[in-house]
């Protein structure tokens, strides 16, 4: 914000390095230690103690307190380098400075390789701990060449020792001729024994190679037998699966045929039921029609009788030309129901209206 920013005034103390307490000789602790025989510059602790030899200048210096003002764990190091606060690209910068100072490329590459090896070792030790590779001997091999060579060297050393012993014995026993004659015999026997050992070793090597070849052949034969047995098992499984499938197909076919037969039977039964229902309905309709015909015939006869009764008053009214309404007397019988009865009633009403003069005059709007 510039000049408009809030101003924070900081006043420096008289002891910015905080060394007054360390230089103060009037404190209670300083005076107590002096009274006990301590002098400035000496180490803390008993001089005759068992661990006095491990005291260093750190025992005489002040204890430095570091305030933890971060969220890192105890002992955590800031930065991704090897040391505390080391930059990651510092080694590249050092190589560049070395080239400017006139160092050779071989020296720079050697230093870079050493730094990389150190980083790898530190990373491996942090992740997996210290690793030590110990030779445990030869585990698998057709020929144990190292052991054979070691045995040969051991036999050579034994021969050299035997020759030295023989020469010393010949010098000591030069006075007696009998001992001189006997002395070469054990040497020859020893030479023969060494040759026999070599021959036995060669035979053992040959037998071991033959055994290894036989074992390989046996392994191959076992593998081929296993493969053949597996193929046979697979064939048997496939045949069993095919037979199971054929059985399932047969069962499904038989089920489908039985279901079709059941369906045909069900359809025939349904058709018979439908026919029976239709016949019942027809019979009911015929009975209802007969009833309606009887009712209509009775209604017609009653209406005819009513018309005959009402003829005499209608003729008298025409002579006098007086319009008087005709009231139909109820017969007291139940009217027939149905479509035909309603139509018959409508026709009867039309006939009655045509026979009545007053109603005709009203229809044709003729004033009497």
UniProtKB/Swiss-Prot annotation:
Residues 1-28, 161-339 are annotated as: Disordered. It comes from the Eukaryota. The keyword Ligase does not apply. Pfam families: G-patch (PF01585). It is found in: Nucleus, Nucleolus. Keywords: Nucleus, Ribosome biogenesis, rRNA processing. InterPro entries: G_patch_dom, PINX1. Its main location: nucleus. One of its GO terms (biological process) is rRNA processing. Involved in rRNA-processing at A0, A1 and A2 sites and negatively regulates telomerase. Belongs to the PINX1 family. PANTHER family: G PATCH DOMAIN CONTAINING PROTEIN (PTHR23149), PROTEIN PXR1 (PTHR23149:SF31). This is Protein pxr1.
């Amino acid at each position: 914000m510039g000049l408009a920013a809030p101003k924070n005034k900081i006043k420096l103390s008289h002891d910015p390095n905080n060394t007054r307490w360390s230089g103060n000789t009037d404190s209670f602790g300083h005076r107590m230690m002096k009274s006990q025989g301590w002098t400035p510059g000496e180490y803390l602790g008993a001089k005759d103690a068992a661990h006095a030899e491990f005291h260093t200048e750190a025992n005489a210096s002040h204890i430095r307190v570091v305030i933890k003002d971060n969220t890192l764990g105890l002992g955590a190091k800031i930065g991704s380098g090897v040391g505390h606060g080391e930059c990651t690209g510092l080694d590249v910068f050092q190589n560049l400075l070395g080239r400017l100072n006139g160092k050779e490329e071989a020296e720079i590459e050697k230093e870079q390789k050493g730094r990389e090896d150190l980083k790898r070792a530190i990373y491996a030790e942090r992740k997996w701990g210290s690793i030590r590779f110990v030779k445990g001997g030869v585990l698998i091999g057709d020929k144990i060449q190292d052991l054979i060579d070691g045995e040969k060297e051991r036999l050579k050393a034994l021969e050299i020792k035997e020759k030295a012993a023989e020469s010393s014995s010949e010098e000591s026993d030069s006075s007696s001729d009998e001992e001189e004659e006997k002395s070469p015999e054990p040497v020859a026997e020893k030479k023969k024994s060494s040759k026999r050992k070599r021959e036995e070793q060669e035979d053992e090597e040959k037998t071991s190679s033959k055994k290894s070849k036989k074992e390989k052949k046996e392994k191959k034969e076992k593998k081929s037998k296993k493969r053949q047995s597996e193929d046979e098992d697979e064939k048997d499984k496939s045949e069993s699966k095919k037979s199971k499938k054929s059985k399932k197909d047969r069962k499904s076919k038989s089920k489908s045929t039985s279901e079709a037969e059941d369906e045909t039977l069900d359809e025939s039964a349904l058709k018979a039921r439908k026919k029976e229902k239709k016949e019942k309905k027809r019979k009911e309709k015929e009975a209802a029609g007969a009833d309606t015909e009887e009712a209509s015939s009775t209604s017609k006869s009653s209406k005819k009788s009513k018309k005959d009764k009402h003829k005499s008053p209608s003729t008298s009214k025409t002579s006098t030309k007086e319009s008087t309404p005709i009231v139909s007397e109820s017969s007291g019988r139940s009217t027939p129901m149905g479509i035909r009865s309603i139509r018959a009633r409508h026709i009867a009403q039309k006939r009655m209206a045509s026979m009545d003069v007053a109603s005709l005059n009203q229809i044709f709007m003729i004033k009497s």
